[in-house]
Amino acid sequence: TQMGYEAYKLDDFGNDIEFPILFWVSEHSILVSISMGEDQHPEYLKTLCQSLSAWRPRQAANGLLLITDVSSLLENNEQITQQADELKSTIKTFNQAFGVSLPIYNVISNMGSISDFCQFFSAFDESKRDEVFGATAPYSKHGGIDADWFNDEYDHLISELIANMSNALAGQLNQDYRNSIASAPFQFGLLKQNLWLFLNRLYRGEQLSDALQFRGFYFTHDGQSSAQSDLLASTVSYSFGHE
């Protein structure tokens, strides 16, 4: 069970098995989790689309939560654009199968792998940490993502971190954590360029068709520890001529 959702009939097969498609059920909705790994297969997606369309003929799905691990945004530009193109192709498959342009909400996950970011929130209570950190875009008839909107919203998130820095520092006595709190807005700011590269590629329009329907970007972390990337140290090192 996660966030009120329970994996449907998972125990019939064993909890240690990773499935390319999983159904998560709650009292108010159903989430379909679709792996983009090597275990996925076009025939699985085709069967899923057919089944959902038969079950809900008028509207097979309400939208897409596109989960992207932040580590994939730290790759080189070519790999980032390739990932965006592959995702775009898969999403188009769903849009064509369902006959709609599904609204897409981008969730950047595993933010704890960015140095200092999660430490910023260490002294806040649970309700504060549970607040949404991201931005929801206004509806656009022809889809796509507006560069000015993205810049304004991302800069606003950086400003929020800076504005809350005093409160974060006041609640944290550990010096290492205090150093991380001071660095967090800079670490977060250094992610902006690569995130824009990814989103702009994913949501750019084409000559004869509308762009995908972008509706927002959000940041989250599942609490699990992982290797960290220090974007600030890498930038400083690069500025001194070190690769």
List PLM regions with ranges:
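Basic, amphipathic N-terminal segments
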Residues: 1-243
